[in-house]
Amino acid sequence: MSKTISINAGSSSLKWQLYLMPEEKVLAKGLIERIGKDDAISTVKFNGQEASETLAIKDHTAAVKILLDDLIHLDIIKSYDEITGVGHRVVAGGTYFNESALVDSEEVIKKVEELALLAPLHNKANAAGIRAFKKILPDITSVVVFDTAFHTTMPEVAYRYPLPNKYFTENQVRKYGAHGTSHYYVAHEAAKILEKPIEKLKLITVHMGNGVSLTAVDGGKSVDTSMGFTPLGGVMMGTRTGDLDPAVIPYLMDNTEDFKTPEDIRRIFNNESGLLGISELSNDMREIEAATAAGNKNATLAYNMFIDRIIKHIGAYAAVMNGVDAIVFTAGIGENDAHIRSEIMKHFDWLGADIVTEKNEKRPVYGVISSNAAKVKVLVIPTDEELVIARDVERLKTK
């Protein structure tokens, strides 16, 4: 038996989950928020209990020490030595990492930092988490698991952009995708639920949270995905634009005071757009739906645009694969919002997909929510990226 921690490090946060492996039992999970502040918050959930404290945490290294000390204080572990492995979620692996990798050299961490060009909001923070654990637990197995790795099976026709070739060969501008660990997990879980080999299935996986992406999974491999060069591409999201005409950028630079620097573009497109930008209210779908029900026109438009973009991608991916066996919803909105699922799927009667209202509205919902007669099954599967990360730590530990 071993104890493995799955880590998702943000710029000011550290989300974690501790597993007993290979049993895959969750011993504890938690979140450290406001790293770098005097009023940071560390929360630990274990055995149906929750412990929280507010304290100063100056950086990620201090956060890791607090995390481990909390585990000892709460009698979840006896000493640091019980932790045998750590797996880190990393958003961008580029073409350099096509699978999870051991952090067995400084070069691996430096490469993760270099790839921040592809995920400026994520990779530097991911690397900070890796360095923090290396400093405090230098001898345990350390693994990096990439959001982009699952999508490295996309054919060139799907991942290339129609730009001059030199921008691909010299600057590596292409589609990389994201949320790959989530898409991988729910695709494989769907195959188990449907009791069919994943090699025989054509699936469309729909990851709907604050970030949203869809993937066409043919025979267990990603053949197309909605997010692009960065997680900004694809469908409309909580605060991100998704795809739009590139000519919008120079137009706004010429005609407004808001778009003067690349940082302005990144900030507005990543943090001020999407549901938030259209509704002028919130990036939270629950608030958007409540406002829509109350007759708020901006919220209604945001809601309908969100659904519209997802419908179009599902239809496109069914065509890309020349058919589809199942559509799988996951992540915060995908798992919890029955109305959104219903609104999306009512556009696919022609495909042979349906939703049984009683199954769809059951809470919690898990598994098939379509009728037995449906040609295309519809499923809801809670994602578990942390478990995939823990499994990869165990797999690479034994290599």
UniProtKB/Swiss-Prot annotation:
Database matches in NCBIfam families: ackA
Stated role: Catalyzes the formation of acetyl phosphate from acetate and ATP. Can also catalyze the reverse reaction.
Name of this chain's protein: Acetate kinase
Metabolic or biological pathway, per its Swiss-Prot or TrEMBL entry: Metabolic intermediate biosynthesis; acetyl-CoA biosynthesis; acetyl-CoA from acetate: step 1/2
Record family assignment: Belongs to the acetokinase family.
A Gene Ontology cellular-component term: cytoplasm
Gene Ontology molecular function terms on file: acetate kinase activity; ATP binding; magnesium ion binding
EC annotation from Swiss-Prot or TrEMBL: 2.7.2.1
SUPFAM superfamilies the UniProt entry points to: Actin-like ATPase domain (SSF53067)
Binding-site positions, Mg(2+): 8, 385
Named cofactor requirement(s): Mg(2+); Mn(2+)
UniProtKB keywords: ATP-binding, Cytoplasm, Kinase, Magnesium, Metal-binding, Nucleotide-binding, Transferase
Pfam families: Acetate_kinase
Chemical reaction(s) catalysed: acetate + ATP = acetyl phosphate + ADP
Cofactor binding comment, as recorded: Mg(2+). Can also accept Mn(2+).
GO biological process: acetate metabolic process; acetyl-CoA biosynthetic process
